[in-house]
Structures are given as C-alpha cells and as structure tokens.
Amino acid sequence: MTINIYNTLTRKKEEFVPLEPGKVKMYVCGPTVYNYIHIGNARPAIVYDTVRKYLEYSGYDVNFVSNFTDVDDKLIKAANELGEDVPTIADRFIQAYFEDVSALGCKKADLHPRVTENMDDIIAFIETLIEKGYAYEADGDVYYSTRSFEGYGKLSHQSIDELKTGARIRVGEKKRDALDFALWKAAKNQEISWDSPWGEGRPGWHIECSAMVKKYLGDTIDIHAGGQDLTFPHHENEIAQSEALTGKPFAKYWMHNGYINIENEKMSKSLGNFVLVHDIVKEQDPDVLRFFMLSVHYRHPINYSMDLLESTKSAFNRLKTSYANLHHRLESSTNITEDNAKWLAKVEEQRATFISEMNDDFNTANAISVLFELAKQANYYMENDHTSEEVIKAFIGLFQEITSVLGFSLEEKHTLEKEVEALIEQRNEARRNRDFALSDQIRDQLKSMNIVLEDTPQGTRWKRGE
C-alpha cells in the first residue's frame, strides 16, 4: 500500500514517491529559542515526529533535520530585558526545548543545526543571490527582489499583484518594493552581529532555513514541514531563495499542521492565553497531551481546554486499563488454540486498518480509533474467559506496535505518581484522625520531592514545583 500526502503546493493528496527509493530527506522548521515552548510549538514537534516514526515503520531511512533560530529580534529583546547575552538565553531554552519534547515522546532529529553555527554558509548563499540578480544591497542591508522570481506566491496560491495590495514599506526600510524582504540586516544599537561583505549585521529569518537545508540535505528535499502560519511568508520566501539559487525544485512535498485555539480563541500574546508545555507536564502525564494532539487530524485546528484534556485523559486511561488487563490475563494464559485463527485474523484486520489510515495522509485520529476498536475486541475476548497465550500476545503486540509509532505508552507508570498518591492518602487519613503532626510530616516529605499540595473542597490536588 502506498502513502498519500496532502501537498500544500498542489492542494491535493499525492502518492509519496521519494527522490531516492527507500530514503527520505525531511526538514521541519524549529523554534526561535527565546522562551519555553507553548502548545502551539508542541503540535508540529509531535505531528512531524509521528510522521517520521511512521515513515521509519514503513521501511524508509529518514534523514530528519530541524533547526534552532538562535539569533532573532525576539532573542535580542529578551537578552536586553534580562540583562544576559543572546547565546546564554539560546542555550538555556534549547536545553528546555529538548526536555519538553522528550517528555512528549519526540525523538531528537538527526541534526539540530543552529543559525549561529552556519553564518558562513548563509553569507555565501546571499552573495550568490546578489550575483544572480535576485537580491540587492542597500546601505548595509540586503533585500531579496521578490518580483525577480517568477514563481513567487505558488505555495500560498496568491498572485504577486494580490500580495502587493496592502504591502507597505516601513519608515527606515531601504527596499525597492514593498514585497521585498530582508536577507541581511545591518547591525544597530550594538546588537549581536557578524562581519559580512556588506558590513556588520545578522541574517534575516527566511534565509536561514534555505541555507541550512542546502547544506545538510541538498538542493531538493522530499518533505518540508511546519505550522500553517509559516506557509506565507516564511515558506514562500524559502522557495523563492532556494529555487533562485539552484534552479531546482526546493521540496517535493509541503506539509502544514493546523492552528491551536485556547478555549475557542486564537492563542496569542495579546490575549495572554499562551499555555506552556513546561507548565502542563508538571500536572499532566505528557502522554495524555500527545494523545490529545494526535486525536485530531494534523491539518485541522485543535481547540485546547483543561476540560478537553481531562476528557482525553479519561479516554486514554480506558486504553491503559484494557492493556493492563491483557497483561494480567497473560499471567494465567493457556495453550488452548480453539478459535485462535478467528481472533488472530481480527488482530491482523486492525493492523491493516491502522496502516490504511496512516497511509491516508497520516490520519492519526482514525489510527487512534483503531486502538479503541482493538481494546473493545480485547475486552470482549477476556470477558468471555478466553485464555490463549498466542491471542493475548497478539493483542499486546499490536497495542505496542501502534503506540510505538504514535509515540506514547500505555504502560503503567509505577514511579512518582503512585508514590505521591499513596502519600496523599496517608496524609488524608492522618487529617481525618486529627494527627496534624503526621499530616505536616507527610506534606514536608512531599515538598522535599518537589511536590506542591493544594487542599480544595473537592480534595487534595498536587503538582510538581518550579
């Protein structure tokens, strides 16, 4: 069976045929590392990690590259506000990024290049664009001449005249056309900068990815992916830069994931409704957040709320219960083979359905439905006192196979959570017995474990401390 991918470039699903049989070159735009990542950043990390895992499951050798933007206006602003230098802030939040996405079940990319480590390549790329007549220098700044590239607008499906409407040249900008964009920005106000043929400065945002893709993956790649908000102008500008330089198609397939809304409102700083992964994973099982993200097709928007996350947790726990019950039944399993063929065929049918759904533009929402159908069949099998070791192992094996691709685990977490819950119950018992000394002692013990308690009318809640 073939994999079909919805290609933003053509606005249709296409059969996935990599440039080189059996191998996939994939690039995902990474974060600007000036703060902890929010759930809007987490969605592409989870989505494209799952795409990568499914491609590998399907037998492809995937070379997966995702960058860090470690110099940018936002980073410079954060450095000024905190009184620290840009590299220190970037290092801190790159480490925080790895911790957060690791908790969410994401593998590291094969390579995580940083902008600041590739400055020579970026400068050389810009020089070539100038030589070819696609860019021009203006008093230390360098701009890309958008009208020089005939295909501009093909990714976002807009004509250059449509884009021209509403475009403005800001005060102080030296570009010739309102649609032109910066490849190199002259240094100002003693901000971090690098030497270049045009004087001290730093690169524009769009050129960074073009240069790093070319350096680490080549002129043309199989899959370029990122959030829907990057389609224009970022990815459109990447195409203009890269195809002008090489004369070749930049990427064969373009994938974009949908937005996340918070309580039915668009997530934005002005609304103050950013939700940091750093905070969620202190209170929630990270697997539940990943499960939540994959419960909706990646191209569709997601509405996030704590109520929805709690509902997702309940559904996730039902799967965990079925999986745990299979393991318990395995302990008393037998070698009876009656009806094995029928039940093994049912398991294989679910495997085939999982593959079919994932082959259809990585439909994780329907793939998760397969898990619930598998759980339903497993529950029926056990409720009717079937005990075949072969069948039980087949159910367990397919649960593990699917969840390893989707990137979460149904294994019971026996460590911190259970210990904390047991201590809270002991403390509640002490309080009921008015043994406040023991109650305080248990609270102090939990505090030493970095666990913060909150006593409410509905009971005691806990979370991990800062």
UniProtKB/Swiss-Prot annotation:
One of its GO terms (molecular function) is ATP binding. Keywords: Aminoacyl-tRNA synthetase, ATP-binding, Cytoplasm, Ligase, Metal-binding, Nucleotide-binding, Phosphoprotein, Protein biosynthesis, Zinc. It catalyses: tRNA(Cys) + L-cysteine + ATP = L-cysteinyl-tRNA(Cys) + AMP + diphosphate. The keyword Membrane does not apply. InterPro entries: Cys-tRNA-ligase, Cys-tRNA-synt_Ia_DALR, Cys-tRNA/MSH_ligase, CysS_C, Rossmann-like_a/b/a_fold, tRNA-synt_1_cat_dom, tRNAsynth_Ia_anticodon-bd. A motif ('KMSKS' region) lies at residues 266-270. Its cofactor is Zn(2+). The modification Phosphoserine is found at S270. A motif ('HIGH' region) lies at residues 31-41. SMART domains: DALR_2. The keyword NAD does not apply. It is found in: Cytoplasm. ATP binds at K269. It is an enzyme of class 6 (ligase). GO terms for biological process: cysteinyl-tRNA aminoacylation. Its EC number is 6.1.1.16. Gene3D superfamilies: Cysteine-tRNA ligase, C-terminal anti-codon recognition domain, HUPs. Belongs to the class-I aminoacyl-tRNA synthetase family. HAMAP family: Cys_tRNA_synth. NCBIfam families: cysS (TIGR00435). Monomer. This is Cysteine--tRNA ligase. The lineage of its organism: Bacteria, Bacillati, Bacillota, Bacilli, Bacillales. The gene is cysS.
